[in-house]
Amino acid sequence: MLTLLIPVDGSDYSRRAVDYAIRRAAATQGPTRVHLLNVQAPIVTVNVKLFVSQESLETYYREEGTKALADTLALAQKAGLETHPHIGVGDAARVVLDYAAEKAVDEIVMGSHGRGALAGALVGSVAQKVVHGASIPVVLVK
């Protein structure tokens, strides 16, 4: 079974990565498992815990992650892929690399840029860090 990890952030690049994975799965002889991973940046301020409970933060991350995953999850499910959505919190590249190792995925498929990308950048910073840190193939989708 081919196992893919697709980091998604709700951007058009994420959708294109899922489109690529659907085509890749169709060309593969056998089933494909797709892990869709959204990574929320941690809210880090000096006194955040004085004003917001840990439960409220976790609810916020879950709600934002669910929104970011919605379109790509529906697209992958409609294509008949076995999907496993997940929401992580932390440094995006580190969370992606750790998740890929934990789930023993075969390949990471991700957009070359995300929501926070600079318009003139050739490759987004998260994508660049993942490419350099991964020990498995990484496909960047434009």
Where are these regions (language model features)?
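Amphipathic, non-transmembrane alpha-helical secondary structure
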Residues: 15-23, 70, 93-97, 101
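General small-molecule cofactor/ligand-binding pocket signal
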Residues: 35-37, 84-88, 139
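Short, flexible loop segments at boundaries between secondary-structure elements
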Residues: 133-142
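Small/aliphatic-rich secondary-structure junction motif
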Residues: 2-52
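A short acidic, glycine-rich active-site loop
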Residues: 54-67
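Glycine-rich, Arg-bearing micro-motifs that act as flexible, cationic patches
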Residues: 107-132
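Structural beta-alpha unit
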Residues: 74-108
